[in-house]
């Protein structure tokens, strides 16, 4: 593989990496992660459980509770140890939350918790992410054909130009979609249902992958455009050099042709033969000498 093919293959690598990052971010549900403050359930159905409030009632005839039960009620009324922290993570499609035992997760659609007036913006964000993936995939296909095909020509330079345009569009669309999703999530945190609102949250690894894909898109776009510009200038210089060589060859042939014409033309007459006495062949009264060559 020559140097040009190696450079094209190296340019294809970050495109595939950006495509992988975008696909992983879209299908995953770790854009935002955090904890929710959830009220502990009573231990009536879970005797001996660790994540519930323990109490027992006195079965005496007067119906009053013993000292242990009163202590438990005192803790319940003050709110100490009343809540438990549950981890959750949210993506474009669903929101998942840990169960009480911490072994499995309970998921629901993220669209179901977004306020109704903001769901259109959520769909715009999802559409931007999908279009971002389509543009990156198109760029990967174009670069793959650029690497696999060996036919030279200026038309292949247009592939680099298209890749640069598609990748910068993908990066800009991805940036807008990421910012729209961030806005939607923050609005949902403030205006969403009470049984979903997180206490603490931060951005997850899916969000980092999405922005990593954005950075790769811009880097590939700049690299492809610089390659196109350099190749275009080189192609133009070669054309100018070829036109200059043809012009110099044409200018070199013109003096040779003129010289050959002079060599094959009539030789000048000697000075002593320039004038001849033709008086015998002229009518009376005409001059006696004429100049001929």
From Swiss-Prot:
Matching entries from PANTHER family are given as:
EPITHELIAL MEMBRANE PROTEIN-RELATED, GERM CELL-SPECIFIC GENE 1-LIKE PROTEIN 2
> What family is this protein classified in?
Belongs to the GSG1 family.
Per the record, the domain of life is Eukaryota
| Predominant subcellular localization, coarse grouping | membrane
Q: Which residues are glycosylated?
A: 59, 67
- The molecule here is called Germ cell-specific gene 1-like protein 2
Q: Which residues lie on this side of the membrane: Extracellular?
A: 30-120, 182-204
Gene (name only): GSG1L2
**What are the TM regions of this chain, as residue ranges?**
9-29, 121-141, 161-181, 205-225
Note the Pfam families from the entry: GSG-1
Keywords for the protein's UniProt record, in alphabetical order: Glycoprotein, Membrane, Transmembrane, Transmembrane helix
Q: How does it sit in the membrane?
A: Multi-pass membrane protein
GO annotation, cellular component aspect: plasma membrane
Give the Gene3D superfamilies listed for this entry. Answer: 1.20.140.150
Q: Which residues lie on this side of the membrane: Cytoplasmic?
A: 1-8, 142-160, 226-293
Q: Is the keyword Phosphoprotein in the record?
A: no
Query: Which locations, inside or outside the cell, does it occupy?
Result: Membrane
């Amino acid at each position: 593989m020559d140097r040009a093919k190696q450079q094209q293959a190296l340019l294809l690598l970050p495109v595939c990496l950006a495509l992988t990052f975008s696909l992983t971010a879209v299908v995953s549900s770790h854009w935002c992660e955090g904890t929710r403050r959830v009220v502990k359930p009573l231990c009536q159905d879970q005797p001996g459980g660790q994540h519930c409030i323990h109490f027992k009632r006195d079965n005496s005839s007067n119906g009053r509770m013993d000292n242990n039960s009163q202590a438990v009620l005192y803790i319940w009324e003050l709110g100490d140890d009343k809540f438990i922290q549950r981890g959750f993570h949210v993506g474009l499609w669903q929101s998942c939350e840990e169960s009480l035992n911490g072994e499995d997760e309970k998921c629901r659609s993220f669209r179901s918790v977004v306020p109704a007036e903001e769901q259109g913006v959520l769909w715009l964000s999802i559409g931007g992410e999908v279009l971002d993936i389509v543009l990156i995939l198109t760029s990967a296909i174009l670069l793959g054909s650029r690497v696999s095909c060996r036919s030279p020509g200026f038309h292949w330079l247009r592939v680099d130009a298209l890749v640069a345009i598609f990748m910068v569009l993908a990066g800009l669309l991805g940036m807008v979609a990421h910012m729209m999703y961030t806005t939607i999530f923050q609005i949902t945190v403030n205006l969403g249902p009470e049984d979903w609102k997180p206490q603490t949250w931060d951005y997850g690894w899916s969000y980092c992958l999405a922005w990593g894909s954005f950075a790769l898109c811009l880097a590939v776009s700049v690299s492809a455009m610089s390659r196109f510009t350099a190749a275009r200038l080189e192609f133009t210089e070669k054309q100018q050099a070829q036109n200059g060589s043809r012009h110099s060859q044409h200018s070199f042939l013109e003096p040779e042709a003129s010289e050959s014409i002079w060599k094959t033309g009539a030789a000048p007459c000697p000075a002593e033969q320039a004038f001849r006495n033709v008086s015998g062949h002229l009518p009376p009264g005409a001059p006696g000498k004429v100049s001929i060559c």
